Amino acid sequence: MVLFGLGRLFYVILLLINAVAVLSEERFLRRIGLGRSNDETPVFGQDQNTTKSKVVQLIGAVQTLLRIPLIGINILVIVYELLLG
Amino acid sequence: MSALFNFRSLLQVILLLICSCSYVHGQWPSLLDRYKNHEVLGAFWKMARVGERASPYVSLACILMAISQFNS
């Protein structure tokens, strides 16, 4: 990578975001009680402030927001690694 | 081609492939289901299936890879 430290940091961040985004909702998250539908139904428009609901919201947001861009970024990184190592 | 001969880079490439295949399968299922029984392209469907079924282990592997990338 061109920028030595930042390239490594980029890989680390990419892998960590991937680690959150692969967790499948219906097979894993719902079983351990972190699924979005498993969340105690909040009162209309009111945010819950427990840690668990924050984690659930974070995982859900990452999955809905970042999955489609991650496809492209992953494929770019794969092609880069295969061609230039 | 050096990613194929360096074990850690190969592992990283496989992990990223599993991740992106499972995203593609979640988003557009017919794209990968079409090649389910294909000899070569069926591998992508298999990787998508691995990413769906074994997602906690894939996620753990991603975190471990990030840690090892961070330390090296």
Curated annotation (Swiss-Prot), chain A:
Biological role: Required for protein transport between endoplasmic reticulum and Golgi apparatus.
Share what the entry says about its subunit structure, partners included.
Answer: Component of the YIP1-YIF1 complex, composed of at least YIF1, YIP1 and YOS1.
User: Which protein, by its recorded name, is this?
Assistant: Protein transport protein YOS1
GO:BP terms for this protein? endoplasmic reticulum to Golgi vesicle-mediated transport; protein transport
Output the InterPro entries linked to this UniProt entry. Answer: Yos1 (IPR013880)
Transmembrane stretches in the record are: 2-22, 65-85
Gene source species: Saccharomyces cerevisiae (strain ATCC 204508 / S288c) (Baker's yeast)
What gene is behind this protein?
Answer: YOS1
Give compartment(s). Endoplasmic reticulum membrane; Golgi apparatus membrane
Which family does the record assign? Belongs to the YOS1 family.
Q: What is its main location?
A: endoplasmic reticulum
What Pfam families does the record point to? Answer: Yos1 (PF08571)
Q: What is its membrane topology?
A: Multi-pass membrane protein
- Gene Ontology terms: cellular component: COPII-coated ER to Golgi transport vesicle; endoplasmic reticulum membrane; Golgi membrane
What keywords is this UniProt entry annotated with?
A: Endoplasmic reticulum, ER-Golgi transport, Golgi apparatus, Membrane, Protein transport, Transmembrane, Transmembrane helix, Transport
Curated annotation (Swiss-Prot), chain B:
Please indicate which superkingdom the organism of origin belongs to.
Eukaryota
Top-level taxonomy: Eukaryota, Fungi, Dikarya, Ascomycota, Saccharomycotina
PANTHER family, per this entry? PROTEIN KISH-A
Q: State the organism of origin.
A: Saccharomyces cerevisiae (strain ATCC 204508 / S288c) (Baker's yeast)
The UniProt transmembrane annotation reads 54-72
Q: Which residues lie on this side of the membrane: Lumenal?
A: 27-53
List the GO biological process terms.
intracellular transport; protein secretion
Q: Does the keyword Secreted apply?
A: no
* Phenotype reported upon loss of the gene: Inviable.
Signal sequence coordinates: 1-26
Extra facts:
'Kish' means small in Hungarian.
Q: Does the keyword Cytoplasm apply?
A: no
Q: What name does the UniProt record give this protein?
A: Protein Kish
Membrane topology type = Single-pass type I membrane protein
GO cellular component term, pick one = Golgi apparatus
Gene name tied to this protein: KSH1
- What is the stated purpose of this protein? Involved in the early part of the secretory pathway.
Query: What family name appears in the similarity comment?
Result: Belongs to the KISH family.
Where does it reside?
Endoplasmic reticulum membrane; Golgi apparatus membrane
Keywords, in A-Z order: Endoplasmic reticulum, Golgi apparatus, Membrane, Signal, Transmembrane, Transmembrane helix
The record's InterPro entries line, in alphabetical order, gives: KISH_domain (IPR051523), Ksh1 (IPR009653)
The primary site where this protein sits is endoplasmic reticulum
